[in-house]
């Protein structure tokens, strides 16, 4: 076995496939392109390739002395896996085994497990012989090597002896017992580079040592222009991305269940309101014989909940006019009360400009300038309507329908219209007219139309199958037409490119030119089709999904850091929390690629995170180290994130905050699906390159030549090529050799004839 080991190329795909052939699972090899940037943890070890020049090689052979960095203690050397390289061209396998067999927590497989158990306590020379006499390792090694060219005997005379002595050599850098060791099979002992700092990782010290070695950090290295390559042995990215996708999809289902729970509470409240309206309609129909004056007194004597002002009949009529429909929308038109005699009301006179009710955007969008069209601005200026909005009360399930979806119809002469509107919503003073019944019928019709539109849109998206989102099953329940949302939450095959600004699809003011250019040009987050559908069901199609800015990102601040590593929990009272496992806080220290991009996108100018919408984040193939995977750095995280993430009780969030968290989860799912797809495609490319590298083309060449001979074309081709070479060679030789002799021969006879 001492002969026949072939040279291996320094290629991460080759080493990854070699690790798989050894039987190791959950490990891959990646190439490091930049020594200045921080490496993503965890890293099992580094494999460093450099050019082994004759001068250096001779010096190493002569220099058998031990320097101060060499470890000569036999107990320490024999305790680690350090083997002398006794076979030529086996340095690649030696470097890989030095990393794998000195690392705990790696599933080695049967071959390497037996090797590690057999060589335990051996000296470096005995371990080197054990590697050389392992046929499994030699077979796996040579299966990924390029076939050596067969040199003809006459061609070997021109090869320089100096050039044959130049070669490349692999060494490994491994952390062992909190110290950095350099394991070189051509050295007698391991090299101890010492411990690393408290505030750094072992990879930081290894990068410094490698930079000093190749002459980047110091100018004393004579071979500063040496060719080198650096590879890292890291965990398999596919397993990591699959586990994160599994957790994210479970958390998406939990958030959808929380939204469904809120929706069911809304349906129950609307059912109670409908039953109360029906009861009052029956009471009003049975008491039609009573004089109108008595009814007016009953209206005035209706009890009002404690803590509220006494409403006048006019205020009660205004409040009743804004009764919510079953779809959850506030109706802005009010019907005047009939006179006592039952006569039709007089024709309405044009109201002065101070009392004009301007049709406005919903309350949660009205104070945003970018959500208004220029025509809306002109109407506001003409009507004298201010943009200021009083602060919102804390979230409550009872106030959900009124605080989130109440329409702001302010007038210049009335300052407490919102208070009167809430009083009108809660007192239910309409006992005489059929306004409640008409509103209920209109609400049922609007809700049925909304349900039909949602069903058609879901069917259309399922037929196209281009968004890759999970379809929502929408059905109506009961006589009130409540909507139930269910989702299968299956993995989407491709990330969605659909815009989450659902209002832009129905022609609202979201595409207003007043939106600032900075927000338009900012990097946006991937779309969330599931959140889009849920937003339409919860808030109505006309209002659209609200832009989830800093006011609605409380759930993202609390749970966004842990949503990809910890499963969320939902209680019966609607409280959502994340159990803080040990790996959740450890994940905060791990920095890297993708999640860092997300946090940079989601952080506003003031440091506040902001969930944005738009197409998927673009990926670069070089970023697919988990620096590819990009987690936020610990120092960049707000302190409230860590504090809130460790709170076991959890919090209760509004529907808009849950939608913001749902969009965040959908964005993570889309990104990790892209990363997983890239890793799978990378493995396929590794196998294709390996087949091209190791393929023996001799059989194909022999078959092709035999086919040419059978067709009678081989002789003519050979004769044609040989004749061309002879003609070119002979003509050139004669021109150079016969010029001077011809001149001499011709000159002598010419002179003789003249004489």
Curated annotation (Swiss-Prot):
Signal peptide: none annotated. The keyword Protease applies. Residues 593-602, 612-636 have a biased composition (Basic and acidic residues). The record marks 184 as: Important for enzyme activity. Residues 483-530, 637-647 have a biased composition (Polar residues). Deubiquitinating enzyme that plays a key role in chromatin by mediating deubiquitination of histone H2A. Catalytic component of the PR-DUB complex, a complex that specifically mediates deubiquitination of histone H2A monoubiquitinated at 'Lys-119' (H2AK119ub1). This is Ubiquitin carboxyl-terminal hydrolase BAP1. The gene is bap1. GO terms for cellular component: cytoplasm; nucleus; PR-DUB complex. Residues 4-235 form the UCH catalytic domain. PANTHER family: UBIQUITIN CARBOXYL-TERMINAL HYDROLASE, UBIQUITIN CARBOXYL-TERMINAL HYDROLASE BAP1. Residues 396-409 have a biased composition (Acidic residues). One of its GO terms (molecular function) is cysteine-type deubiquitinase activity. Coiled coil: none annotated. The record marks 85 as: Transition state stabilizer. A motif (Nuclear localization signal) lies at residues 743-748. Residues 342-351 have a biased composition (Pro residues). The active site is at 91 (nucleophile), 169 (proton donor). Pfam families: Peptidase_C12, UCH_C. It is found in: Cytoplasm; Nucleus. Keywords: Chromatin regulator, Cytoplasm, Hydrolase, Nucleus, Protease, Thiol protease, Ubl conjugation pathway. Disruption phenotype: Neuronal hyperplasia, suggesting a role in Notch signaling pathway. Its EC number is 3.4.19.12. Belongs to the peptidase C12 family. BAP1 subfamily.
């Amino acid at each position: 076995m001492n002969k026949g080991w072939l040279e291996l190329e320094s290629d991460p795909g080759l080493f990854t496939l070699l690790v798989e052939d050894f039987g190791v699972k959950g490990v891959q090899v990646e190439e490091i392109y930049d020594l200045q940037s921080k490496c993503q943890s965890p890293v099992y070890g580094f494999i460093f390739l450099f050019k082994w020049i004759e001068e250096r090689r001779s010096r190493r052979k002569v220099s058998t002395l031990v320097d101060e960095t060499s470890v000569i203690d036999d107990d320490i050397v024999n305790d680690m896996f350090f083997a002398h390289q006794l076979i030529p061209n086996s340095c690649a396998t030696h470097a890989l085994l030095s990393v794998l067999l000195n690392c705990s927590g790696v599933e080695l497989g049967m071959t390497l497990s037996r090797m590690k158990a057999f060589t335990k306590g051996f000296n470096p020379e005995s371990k080197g012989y054990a590697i050389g006499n392992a046929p499994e390792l030699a077979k796996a090694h040579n299966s990924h090597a390029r076939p050596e060219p067969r040199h003809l005997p006459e061609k070997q005379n021109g090869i320089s002896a100096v050039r044959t002595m130049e070669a490349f050599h692999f060494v490994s850098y491994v952390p062992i017992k909190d110290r950095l060791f350099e394991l070189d099979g051509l050295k007698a002992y391991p090299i101890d580079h010492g411990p690393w700092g408290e505030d750094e990782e072992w990879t930081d010290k290894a990068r410094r040592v490698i930079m000093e070695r190749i002459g980047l950090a110091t100018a004393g290295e004579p071979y500063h222009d040496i060719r080198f390559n650096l590879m890292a042995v890291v965990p398999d990215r596919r397993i990591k991305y699959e586990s994160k996708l599994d957790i994210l999809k479970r958390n998406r289902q939990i958030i959808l269940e929380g939204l469904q729970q809120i929706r069911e509470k809304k349906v129950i409240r609307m059912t109670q309101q409908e039953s109360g309206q029906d009861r009052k309609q029956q009471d009003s129909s049975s008491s039609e014989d009573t004089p109108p004056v008595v009814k007016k007194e009953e209206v005035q004597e209706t009890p009002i909940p404690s803590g509220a002002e006494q409403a006048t009949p006019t205020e009660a009529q205004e409040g009743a006019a804004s009764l919510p429909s079953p779809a959850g929308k506030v109706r802005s038109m009010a019907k005047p009360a009939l006179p006592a005699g039952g006569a039709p009301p007089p024709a309405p006179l044009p109201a002065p400009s101070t009392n004009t009710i301007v049709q406005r955007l919903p309350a949660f969008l009205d104070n945003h300038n970018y959500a208004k069209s220029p025509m809306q601005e002109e109407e506001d200026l003409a009507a004298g309507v201010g943009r200021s909005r009083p602060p919102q009360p804390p979230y409550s399930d009872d106030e959900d329908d009124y605080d989130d979806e109440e329409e702001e119809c302010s007038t210049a002469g009335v300052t407490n219209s919102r208070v009167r509107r809430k009083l009108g919503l809660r007192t239910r003073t309409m006992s005489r007219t059929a306004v409640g019944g008409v509103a209920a019928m209109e609400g049922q019709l609007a809700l049925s139309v909304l349900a039909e539109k949602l069903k058609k849109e879901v069917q259309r998206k399922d037929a196209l199958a281009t968004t890759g989102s999970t379809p929502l099953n929408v059905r109506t329940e009961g006589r009130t037409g409540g909507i139930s949302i269910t989702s299968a939450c299956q993995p989407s095959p491709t990330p969605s490119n659909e815009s989450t600004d659902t209002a832009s699809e129905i022609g609202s003011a979201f595409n207003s030119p007043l939106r600032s250019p900075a927000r338009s040009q900012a990097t946006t987050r991937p779309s969330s089709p599931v959140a889009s559908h849920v937003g339409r069901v919860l808030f109505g199609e006309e209002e659209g999904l609200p832009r989830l800015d800093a006011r609605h990102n409380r759930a993202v601040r609390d749970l966004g850091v842990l949503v990809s590593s910890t499963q969320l929990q939902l209680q019966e009272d609607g409280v959502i929390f994340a159990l803080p496992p040990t790996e959740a806080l450890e994940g905060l220290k791990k920095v890297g690629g993708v999640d860092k991009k997300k946090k940079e996108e989601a952080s506003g100018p003031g440091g506040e995170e902001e969930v944005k919408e738009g197409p998927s984040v673009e990926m670069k193939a070089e970023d697919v180290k988990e620096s590819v995977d990009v987690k936020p750095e610990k120092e960049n995280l707000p302190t409230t994130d860590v504090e809130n993430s460790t709170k076991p009780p959890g919090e209760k969030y509004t529907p808009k905050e849950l939608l913001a968290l749902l969009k965040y989860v959908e964005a993570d799912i889309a990104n990790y699906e892209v990363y997983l797809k890239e890793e799978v495609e990378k493995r396929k490319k590794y196998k294709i390159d390996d087949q091209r590298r190791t393929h023996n083309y001799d059989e194909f060449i022999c078959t092709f030549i035999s086919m040419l001979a059978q067709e009678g074309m081989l002789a003519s081709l050979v004769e044609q090529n040989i004749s061309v070479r002879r003609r070119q060679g002979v003509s050139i030789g004669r021109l150079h050799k016969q010029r001077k002799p011809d001149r001499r021969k011709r000159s002598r006879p010419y002179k003789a004839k003249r004489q």
